[in-house]
A protein has these predicted regions:
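Low-complexity, glycine/proline-biased repetitive segments and flexible coils/loops
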Residues: 2-374
Length: 374
């Protein structure tokens, strides 16, 4: 995820172009109503109504929408974590869109919500080659009509397992395992119609690559690289650098940062789970990459990478944006931790597992959030 957008999240790209009605502004001409979602038309007092889809459904507009403009956030499922001092899962892509008044939103518009990818399976014995975590699934919305609009957010890439094959990549790339495979690239989603080039640089879609595994500048056995997030690349592994730390202990790389979208902030959705509200926070951070699994034994607990690319308390299960923390292994073994799951409905990646197979975790499910002025 080496290419990162410098755009503010609020500066989303109107990728369907001008409509000829721009001078009319975004005021709704006449009554506008819509239905659908697990949260159906909540009005938190900021002038917008919101529909939140945490599972498949339909966004239904029963009558002529007039000049209404529909804005949305579509997030793919996060990738699953790798196993045994392995890479963290990459976050799902985030697509932030605003449909013009000419878009064919009248009628029934199908929504699918991508599930998170599964963690890498147990290879049968410690330190044996394993398969990567599974990629997350794509999230889509389709506005039918004579010229349908199809919008897709790709699922995140799975984290590489110990000595396993290189991951194929996804929305944001999954982290490489300990011996330092190359970074896993990000894949921008395709959209139809797509009059403008789609790039990893942001604007319409947000995703980043992972980090290579290991860190040649750090002593000790290498750990995995963090999965990429919508707002930043995954990080390299590193020695903790603490006094009296065992030099053979290496901390897994942190996951890449999530991307903020203030118009979709957690406090606007009081009926969503409290951990979801905390992870998205007052700035609406989604799609954090997952931390990688740590390597080695010693007094550092935990030694897994942090989720979401943020400096949260060590041991926190997720970072801002819902990326899972990586697993840590230390002596005595009862203090070891497994990789943590990506938080559902954030698109966060699943944490990588640590040495001696402390276990990896699944990526978080995606989400679709639609809003319009009322």
């Amino acid at each position: 995820m080496g290419i990162k957008s410098n755009l503010l999240a609020s500066a989303y790209y109107n990728f369907f172009g001008a409509t000829g009605k721009d001078s009319a502004g975004s005021n709704i001409a006449g009554p506008f109503s819509a239905s659908g979602g697990n949260i159906d038309g909540i009005t938190p007092g900021n002038g917008y109504a919101y529909h939140v889809f945490t599972s498949p459904g339909n966004f239904t507009v029963p009558s002529d929408p007039g000049e209404a403009e529909v804005e949305g956030l579509i997030i793919g499922g996060g990738g699953g974590g790798g196993r045994q001092h392995a890479g963290g899962g990459g976050a799902g892509s985030v697509v932030h869109f605003k449909l013009p008044a000419s878009a064919p939103i009248l009628g029934t518009n199908a929504v699918t919500v991508g599930g998170g990818g599964n963690a890498a399976p147990w290879p049968g014995a410690a330190d044996q080659p394993g398969t990567p975590g599974s990629d997350g699934n794509n999230t889509t919305i389709t506005f039918p009509g004579s010229t349908p609009y199809n919008i897709t957010a790709n699922g995140g890439g799975g984290g590489q397992a110990n000595n396993g094959p290189h991951p194929t990549g996804g929305g944001s790339g999954g982290g490489a395992y300990n011996s330092g495979g190359p970074e896993v690239t990000a894949t921008a989603p395709t959209t139809s119609p797509s009059p403008a080039a789609i790039t990893d640089a942001g604007g319409k879609s947000y995703q980043n690559p992972s980090c290579p595994g290991g860190n040649p500048t750090s002593p000790g056995s290498p750990a995995g690289g963090g999965g990429g997030g919508a707002g930043g690349v995954g990080q390299k592994a590193g020695n903790p650098g603490q006094p009296n730390a065992n030099p053979t202990v290496q901390v897994g790389g942190n996951g890449g940062a999530g991307q903020p979208f203030p118009g979709f902030a957690g406090p606007l959705f009081p009926t969503m789970p409290t951990d979801w509200q905390a992870a998205t926070g007052p700035t609406g951070i989604f799609a954090g990459g997952a931390g990688a699994g740590g390597h080695g034994t010693g007094p550092v607990t935990p030694n897994g990478g942090l989720g979401g690319g943020v400096k949260t308390e060590p041991g926190a299960s997720t970072g801002a944006g819902g990326g899972g923390a990586g697993g840590g292994y230390a002596s005595p073994e009862p203090t070891s931790t497994s990789g943590n799951a990506g938080l559902d409905n954030t698109g966060g990646g699943g944490g990588g597992g640590a040495s001696n197979d402390t276990g990896a975790s699944d990526g978080g499910d995606g989400v679709v959030i639609i809003r319009y002025l009322v």
